[in-house]
């Protein structure tokens, strides 16, 4: 179901959440991928790892912003992103930051895909973490929207927040 503003409900149990995420990662028109996910689990990374690598191979710029809130995010899942940080021969890049403030709940989930050239894009925003449950089997609600400008602005705001620290080997060692 959708409305005139191009918003649609996307759920894991319908199969649509994973299908939409996979489609957006594969879509050659999207050269920017912004992942704002409170909890990143190895089970979720395993579902999208090959497509993240394909996006990087074709020149996409990928940013992950997660958190150490409640120590839920998986070390191995962050390791996948850490291994890919930096500039790649294709002109692509991957950056990752961790929002670290024990006094603040950090709980957003947004998967934002856009074209740097046209500004067009798709976002999936709702309750799905980057986990097998969040993408395939859990009871989660997400909206698919083509209205992404405000989301990108807010993502950039969080990205530049002083509490969003770069993911590094040293940071990950302390997190273990």
Where are these regions (language model features)?
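PLD/PLD-like phosphodiesterase catalytic module centered on the HKD motif
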Residues: 1-176
């Amino acid at each position: 179901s959708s409305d005139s503003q191009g918003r649609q409900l996307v759920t894991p149990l319908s199969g649509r959440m994973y299908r939409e995420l996979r489609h957006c990662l594969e879509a050659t028109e999207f050269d920017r991928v912004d992942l704002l996910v409170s909890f990143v689990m190895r089970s979720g990374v395993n579902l999208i790892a090959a497509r993240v690598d394909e996006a990087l191979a074709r020149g996409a710029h990928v940013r992950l912003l997660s958190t150490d809130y409640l120590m839920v995010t998986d070390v191995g899942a962050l390791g996948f992103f850490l291994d890919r940080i930096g500039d790649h021969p294709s002109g692509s890049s991957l950056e990752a930051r961790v929002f670290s403030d024990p006094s603040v709940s950090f709980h957003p989930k947004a998967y934002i895909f856009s074209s740097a050239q046209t500004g067009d894009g798709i976002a999936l925003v709702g309750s799905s973490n980057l986990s097998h449950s969040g993408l395939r089997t859990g009871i989660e609600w997400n909206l698919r929207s083509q209205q992404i400008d405000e989301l990108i602005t807010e993502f950039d705001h969080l990205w530049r927040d002083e509490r969003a620290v770069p993911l590094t080997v040293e940071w990950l060692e302390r997190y273990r």
